[in-house]
Amino acid sequence: MWIQVRTMDGKETHTVNSLSRLTKVQELRKKIEELFHVEPQLQRLFYRGKQMEDGHTLFDYDVRLNDTIQLLVRQSLALPLSTKERDSELSDSDSGYGVGHSESDKSSTHGEGTADGDDKTVWEDTDLGLYKVNEYVDVRDNIFGAWFEAQVVQVQKKALSEEEPCSSSAIMAPEDDIMYHIKYDDYPEHGVDIVKAKNVRARARTVIPWEDLEVGQVVMANYNVDYPRKRGFWYDVEICRKRQTRTARELYGNVMLLNDSQLNNCRIIFVDEVLKIELPNERSPLIGSPSRRKSGPSCQYCKDDENKPCRKCACHICGGREAPEKQVLCDECDMAFHLYCLQPPLTCVPPEPEWYCPSCRTDSSEVVQAGEKLKKSKKKAKMASATSSSRRDWGKGMACVGRTTECTIVPANHFGPIPGVPVGTMWRFRVQVSESGVHRPHVAGIHGRSNDGAYSLVLAGGYEDDVDNGNFFTYTGSGGRDLSGNKRTAGQSSDQKLTNNNRALALNCHSPINEKGAEAEDWRQGKPVRVVRNMKGGKHSKYAPAEGNRYDGIYKVVKYWPEKGKSGFIVWRYLLRRDDTEPEPWTREGKDRTRQLGLTMQYPEGYLEALANKEKNRKRPAKALEQGPSSSKIGKSKRKSTGPATTSPRVSKKSKLEPYTLPLQQANLIKEDKGNAKLWDDVLSSLQDGPYQIFLSKVKEAFQCICCQELVFRPVTTVCQHNVCKDCLDRSFRAQVFSCPACRYDLDHSSPTRVNQPLQTILNQLFPGYGSGR
């Protein structure tokens, strides 16, 4: 296993080899010291937001193959200065002589004085102001920006200070110095609020007929910001569009909010309730009981029905509205809770400035602070490796490193070939086969479900009863072995049963399930099984690959039956026959196709570099022995003669790859897709010097939907030349988002979206069946 270690500034990166999942953090620090020349006590290691501490293993932090760990170098602690050195370094500013207050001190002192002056502002009652006591007005809220109905309770002005001259201009207080004490009509429980004069105006009471509404006119209308089709609050609206048909009237405007912000092109639903904005002193003050405007309920669930329990606007646990003074609000979800409804109940309102309910509160005991040890994981404590008394280092196997990527182009229960994986594709390790989606389990030989069927299997020669004849083979079921103690394999110790994966593989046979075995009436009608051959099967079969794992195509179950195996126990046998249009990879046609597609052995990222570094480190001691003073000519000749034999056979010289040529039909379809001509030019350039697999990866990257992050299915090419799945774009339109998901370009949602058929045809040919499950 190997990982990457990178400094925080990103300037230096090294690969650390020869690691295990059970490698301790303190052991990792020693390896890092050899590469970065940083002492272990000066190293701070970070992985996925956690600081790695000594005593834990890489498995505890879930560090996987080729992951990156960040290194932060601590500054070495300097020794304290002596008394003489410290006195000699003191300057005049340090000693405090001849220097007044600093700029920060001045600003802070000035700020305190200003605050005191504001707190000492004196307000007194006055008869001035545009609106008098008991007059009904409209008041703008500082949170929503909407206008609410209210009544003036008191009017105050800023009192004159002794320093201000008593002039006529001072006697006539400006409107900015007027403060109104108001009481909301719809919210009497809020009591009296104090608002500035700029947020108060005369009560709107005149309904503007539809015929008198004009574009550019500023009116007051009802609008719901969260739910545009429902009744909401009253806002100032600038009319931008007016349209009338035989059956409907449409009014659009810009809804004005706080701080000159606005919502553009909003449709006003209630066109018969548009009100005129009253100007100051335009009409007589409104003192009598006016008619009330209709506003939307503050709670969309209970519609402000006080007799109806509601867990949204009342107590979130019991739904009761009683005892509001004994309710506390959560600062995260804004839900109310009775003190006595909480578990455990509270005796009083918490004095903390911020309080969180049990659902929103973060358990501080689960938070790992910097420098703390990890919390014990219940999941890892139940693993066989945690309870085993064996000292074997199981963390070096490639089956333990975990997947770095996952196949999402088709679901896990997909029958048939994986799109983009041709017959003859080779991988060095089983974990890579899992990442490609051909066979997802890391260790198990059969991937399937007992109520659905088997999707894939690996022929690795693990059972002595297996017989491989290439186009057909006899496969032995799983089970009947004691794998306790985290074993990977063992001898047959009991009879196999037709359950779990054995039953799943039997379901692929085109015949009703039978506990005594069955044979397919038409074996080609059975469910397909992907077959992967492993190099371990070479001891029993000549069709196994020389290295790694190889995908050999689609097979189908002809029959299955129980019989006594070589071990003396009952085993389930399955006869599978090949049913694939692509040629077998061991035939001449298959080898030619493999060479044509440029299919080569795939290694994990960083594997060849790690192998080369390992060989390089192995040769260093040998070279030191050659250059030693005690070495003789005979010794040198022996060392030189054995040198070539020590080189790894795995690092082989790459053969020259033939450039892949697209079929004529696909080339013509690419020419038809003129909207993506630039993308296709970049993708086709990879065919010149890269294998077919790189070409497919380029296609996936170029035509990935930005919404679902998958290869586009039923693609829609927008006018801004971006490709999105039709379902994703329709979902965006239903959410009233009419812009391109990639660049926010405004799209025409009035016309139906059209699928790019040439692009869809190409993708179906390159990735057949990739639309399964979508």
UniProtKB/Swiss-Prot annotation:
Enzyme Commission numbers on file: 2.3.2.27
Function, as annotated: Multidomain protein that acts as a key epigenetic regulator by bridging DNA methylation and chromatin modification. Specifically recognizes and binds hemimethylated DNA at replication forks via its YDG domain and recruits DNMT1 methyltransferase to ensure faithful propagation of the DNA methylation patterns through DNA replication.
Annotated source species: Rattus norvegicus (Rat)
Gene that this polypeptide is encoded by: Uhrf1
Name of the protein in question: E3 ubiquitin-protein ligase UHRF1
Lineage of source species: Eukaryota, Metazoa, Chordata, Craniata, Vertebrata
Zn finger residue spans: PHD-type: 296-363
Primary subcellular site in the record, as a coarse category: nucleus
Domain note: The tudor-like regions specifically recognize and bind histone H3 unmethylated at 'Arg-2' (H3R2me0), while the PHD-type zinc finger specifically recognizes and binds histone H3 trimethylated at 'Lys-9' (H3K9me3). The tudor-like regions simultaneously recognizes H3K9me3 through a conserved aromatic cage in the first tudor-like subdomain and unmodified H3K4 (H3K4me0) within a groove between the tandem subdomains.
Region feature (Tudor-like 2): 212-280
Gene Ontology cellular-component terms listed: chromatin; euchromatin; heterochromatin; nuclear matrix; nucleus; replication fork
GO biological process: one example: protein ubiquitination
Region (Histone H3R2me0 binding): 330-334, 350-352
